[in-house]
Amino acid sequence: MIGLRPAFSTMLFLLLLTGGVYPLLTTALGQWWFPWQANGSLIHKDNVIRGSALIGQSFTAAGYFHGRPSATADTPYNPLASGGSNLAASNPELDAQIQARVAALRAANPQASSAVPVELTTASASGLDNNLTPGAAAWQIPRVAAARQLPVEQVAQLVAEYTHRPLARFLGQPVVNIVELNLALDALQGHRAK
């Protein structure tokens, strides 16, 4: 019985430390140092939450930039069903999905003469990716500009403004946050695209 007391005391101490003190401390420090990130990186426009800077949204109208396909099953970009498709590169079903996406993208972007960017045809590992490469965003500029009746140069400038570059090249590649970019397009014109 005497041998159980130190084990029980240690267990109780570690339970309080890892189950109480540590979570409360990290939550408090996160709220203090990084309040925007700790609260989900929510994007507010007109006192309404429009989305998160970390989770993509399904944009299908011609006047919006389209993000990567979502791998979430029934509802695109459903964070509760996050995950990849788990289809191997050699799987014929994945090939059929990619071919269908390429055909749909070609039909929606007849002005684009170059190859369809890979990230517009394949889902990310989470299925919720909100970022595209600047090249994939640039590929869509003619369609978005035509749908919104804006000069191509103005839309290209907006893409350049919303291109986030890493602090150093070895820390990643430049990305365009599609949610932020589409909200900026709406703000530019004062309405939502159809």
Curated annotation (Swiss-Prot):
**Where mainly located?**
membrane
Which parts pass through the membrane?
A: 12-34
Arranged from A to Z, the UniProt key words for this protein are:
ATP-binding, Cell inner membrane, Cell membrane, Ion transport, Membrane, Nucleotide-binding, Potassium, Potassium transport, Transmembrane, Transmembrane helix, Transport
- Compartment(s) where it occurs, according to its Swiss-Prot or TrEMBL record: Cell inner membrane
Under the GO molecular function aspect, what terms does this record hold?
ATP binding; P-type potassium transmembrane transporter activity
The record lists its disulfide bonds as none
Top-rank taxon of the source lineage equals: Bacteria
Instruction: Report the membrane topology from the UniProt record.
Output: Single-pass membrane protein
Q: Any one cellular component term from GO for this entry?
A: plasma membrane
Stated family:
Belongs to the KdpC family.
- What task does this protein carry out? Part of the high-affinity ATP-driven potassium transport (or Kdp) system, which catalyzes the hydrolysis of ATP coupled with the electrogenic transport of potassium into the cytoplasm. This subunit acts as a catalytic chaperone that increases the ATP-binding affinity of the ATP-hydrolyzing subunit KdpB by the formation of a transient KdpB/KdpC/ATP ternary complex.
* Subunit field text: The system is composed of three essential subunits: KdpA, KdpB and KdpC.
Q: Give the protein name, as stated in the record.
A: Potassium-transporting ATPase KdpC subunit
Organism of derivation: Salmonella choleraesuis (strain SC-B67)
